[in-house]
């Protein structure tokens, strides 16, 4: 994100799994633009309504991700395997050619959760990146 927007270090806040703290802070301290960027698993948790994304306090909803895969046209076997998956990385791998479409759906739902927590004065972008730092999805803003 820093390279994309040519931002100085002080323009970035690394909140880790505590995006909820950021979202609770912003209504009283509004900013014009917020980009929430992270990996697929963290943002799948946000898409599921979790504001604390730490692994000890929230889990990826494999059933919901399986339903998203079904909506994207995945076959029943892939959907069933996704619903039984041990983690988000496995589900993303099962998505195959639908990987980016699934990431876009997750990013869009995560954005809806973030917008619901804010006052509406902040434009919200959600970006999902892979382990190499490449974008899988970007929505909003």
Language-model features: locations:
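A structural signal for small-residue-enriched, beta-sheet-centric alpha/beta enzyme cores
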Residues: 1-105, 109-131
């Amino acid at each position: 994100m820093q390279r994309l927007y040519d931002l100085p270090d002080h323009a970035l806040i690394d909140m880790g799994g505590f995006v909820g703290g950021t979202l609770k802070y912003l209504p009283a301290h509004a900013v014009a633009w917020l980009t929430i960027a992270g990996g697929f698993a963290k943002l799948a948790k946000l898409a599921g309504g979790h504001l604390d994304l730490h692994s000890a306090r929230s889990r990826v909803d494999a059933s919901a991700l399986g339903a998203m895969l079904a909506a994207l046209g995945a076959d029943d076997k892939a959907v069933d395997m996704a619903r039984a998956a041990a983690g988000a990385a496995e589900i993303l791998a099962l998505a195959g050619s639908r990987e980016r479409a699934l990431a876009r759906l997750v990013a869009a739902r995560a954005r809806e959760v973030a917008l619901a927590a804010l006052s509406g004065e902040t434009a919200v972008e959600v970006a999902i990146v892979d382990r190499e730092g490449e974008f899988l999805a970007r929505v909003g803003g």
